[in-house]
């Protein structure tokens, strides 16, 4: 869900900058997150798919803050959970591949045929997470749970 790509560039200009044709569905949002703390002795490199939705639970974990992960769409980037990036059109990226909702296709990173059960489970998870998130916002759920302040 990164939203800081070069808006002013056309796809052609962005492709020229990248050195290859840009994929406007998935690649345009590719970004990097760098967190720094004086308390970390050795660098930690996380090489999994994540999104800006994952920053809050990651910071909550690092600061030792308690939170109910069921009420948050993102995941702690430092957890052992596989990465999951959800796009507003229900397309998504996992550690195994990517699903394009506009074509209803799942492409495995290794080029193999996707397991239909895996794809169905991930698609259901994505649809549920989006529905829960929308319901939380539509019903002002956080105010109900935590009260107005």
Range-by-range predicted roles:
Residues 1-149:
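Solvent-exposed soluble domains appended to multi-pass membrane proteins
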